[in-house]
């Protein structure tokens, strides 16, 4: 749907259907805002066994969309998309299969063939979060790899992916020319506590760290980011709940 926003009042109007795609779970604008990418969180996109990504050109005059192309997301259930800072590649996290991938963005905004695919693997995380408050019923999908987010750091040299099912934050090096993802050494850092369920994160403005939300533990953890190596180091963890909750 396209919605018009009044910049002065924030009022929303003119809700208009502009395109139909299967189960659109997440979307992101390309660098510059001229293109839009939409993830279809399915496992049978266009008759295949994976999810899909649809690329659109955005009409700057009215916000209308023109479909450019569609690609296989290289895994089942894609739930997160992000562009690299230079706008040359699109990153995708496939939740159901636990795989992540990079796609080249062509000059016209179309997506090319995947330049890199990484299947995250390992033992499943704890079924119940160790750091959860008493009475918490937060238990979900600690049964195998489930990539929940992927994003490049502000420098564009490193890529990070949270895996809720494995309780890990994966660390990759990114070749900006080829779009190849290479596991860093070590390839991941464990979540702040067993069963924490790392989900989404944001980088500091300086690019020297990130804040990560642990969905199951209801906590926020800060990770220091070494700009030379791209490696993360766990810092402080705080509760995301009100005092006494």
Q: Which residues make up each language-model segment?
A:
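A short loop-to-beta-strand structural motif that recurs across blades of beta-propeller domains
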Residues: 1, 51-54, 99-101, 168-170, ...
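Short loop/turn segments immediately following beta-strands, especially the blade-tip
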Residues: 3-10, 56-63, 102-113, 172-181, ...
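A short beta-strand motif characteristic of beta-propeller blades
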Residues: 13-19, 66-71, 115, 134-140, ...
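Blade-loop segments of beta-propeller domains
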Residues: 14-87
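Beta-rich, blade/repeat-based domains predominating
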Residues: 21-32, 74-89, 121-156, 191-209, ...
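Residue position within the beta-strands of beta-propeller blades
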Residues: 38-39, 92, 161, 212
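Short glycine/acidic-enriched loop and turn motifs that connect beta-strands
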Residues: 41-47, 96-99, 166-168, 217-219
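Loop-centered beta-sheet repeat module
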Residues: 156-215
């Amino acid at each position: 749907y396209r919605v018009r926003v009044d910049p002065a009042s924030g009022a929303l109007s003119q809700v208009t259907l502009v395109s139909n795609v299967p189960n659109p779970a997440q979307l992101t604008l390309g660098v510059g805002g001229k293109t839009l990418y939409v993830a279809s969180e399915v496992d049978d996109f266009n008759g295949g066994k994976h999810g899909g990504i649809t690329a659109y050109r955005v009409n700057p005059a009215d916000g209308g969309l023109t479909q450019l192309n569609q690609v296989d997301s290289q895994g089942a259930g894609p739930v997160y998309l992000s562009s690299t800072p230079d706008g040359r590649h699109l990153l995708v996290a496939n939740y159901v299969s636990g795989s992540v991938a990079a796609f080249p963005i062509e000059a016209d905004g179309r997506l090319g063939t995947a330049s890199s695919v990484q299947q995250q693997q390992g033992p499943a995380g704890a079924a119940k979060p160790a750091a959860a408050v008493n009475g918490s019923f937060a238990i979900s999908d600690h049964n195998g790899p489930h990539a929940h987010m992927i994003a490049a750091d502000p420098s564009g040299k490193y890529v990070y992916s949270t895996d809720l099912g494995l309780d890990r934050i994966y660390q990759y090096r990114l070749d900006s020319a080829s779009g190849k993802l290479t596991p860093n050494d070590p390839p991941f850092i464990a979540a702040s506590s067993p069963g924490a369920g790392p989900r989404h994160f944001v980088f500091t403005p300086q690019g020297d760290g990130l804040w990560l939300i642990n969905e199951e533990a209801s906590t926020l953890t800060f990770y220091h980011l070494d700009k030379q190596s791209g490696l993360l180091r766990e810092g402080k963890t705080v509760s995301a709940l009100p005092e006494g909750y």
